[in-house]
Amino acid sequence: MKNTVKLEQFKEVTEAELQEIRGGDWRISETIRNLIFPRRK
């Protein structure tokens, strides 16, 4: 059930990131995204 809560919180974060990208703060949102989803090659 905790996964459902995390998804709800993630949706809110995603919407906030989209607004930041529109504002031109794409560097900050990219850093947050990297922290949430570390790139593994």
Swiss-Prot record:
GO biological process, one term: establishment of competence for transformation
Cleaved propeptide residues: 1-24
InterPro entries named in the record: Bacteriocin_signal_seq (IPR010133), Competence_ComC (IPR004288)
Pfam families: ComC
Keyword Plastid: no
Highest taxon listed in the record's lineage: Bacteria
Keywords for the protein's UniProt record, in alphabetical order: Competence, Pheromone, Secreted
GO cellular component, one term: extracellular region
Localisation: Secreted
Main location group: secreted
GO molecular function: pheromone activity
Keyword Secreted applies: yes
Biological function: Acts as a pheromone, induces cells to develop competence for genetic transformation.
Family named by the database record: Belongs to the ComC family.
The protein's name: Competence-stimulating peptide
Organism whose genome encodes this protein: Streptococcus oralis
Gene expressing this chain: comC
